Amino acid sequence: MGTASIKLNKKTALFLATALMGLLSCAKNEAGENDFEPPKLTVLSPQEGQVFANGDTIHIVAEATDNAALHEYAWGIYDTAGVIVPSQFGLVHDEKRYTIRGSHVVGGIATTTLWTVWVHSDDERDNYDDYEINIIVSP
């Protein structure tokens, strides 16, 4: 059984991801009612410009911290055409610190190309932080 991919440009993909997170946020509690400080993301892996080949695993590791309470996170990998290679969303409630983890095995790459890893975290008041890392994938 094969996998399907959806071709979206990056702005459309980010809009859809944000809309999904907005829908998920309907169940938020009132924690952090006066919180105007966004979470802080520290991406530990991958590194900017890191090179991956077919068969390699891209490990996404990021630390999200917030002064009040984290709410959710997302990560995705986009190719140069804006196609989402993989992505993941998750809910994190009432935590001030959370380690975001994900992975993707590179496969089917015929020519060297640039991919973008996107990591996102928001808190209970919809304050957010986004981070992008460019990586190189090759056959």
Task: Annotate each language-model stretch with its function.
Residues 50, 60-68, 121-123:
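Extracellular acidic, Ser/Thr/Pro-rich low-complexity tracts
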Residues 2-14:
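Bacterial N-terminal signal peptides that target proteins for export
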Residues 94-103:
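Aromatic sugar-binding surface patches on proteins
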Residues 67-79:
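Solvent-exposed loop/turn segments flanking beta-strands in beta-repeat/beta-sandwich domains
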Residues 22-25:
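C-terminal motif of bacterial Sec signal peptides marking the signal peptidase cleavage site
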Residues 30-41:
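Proline/serine/threonine-rich low-complexity linkers at boundaries of modular beta-sandwich domains
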Residues 131-137:
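C-terminal edge beta-strand
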Residues 106-113:
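Surface-exposed, short loops/turns at beta-strand junctions within beta-sandwich domains
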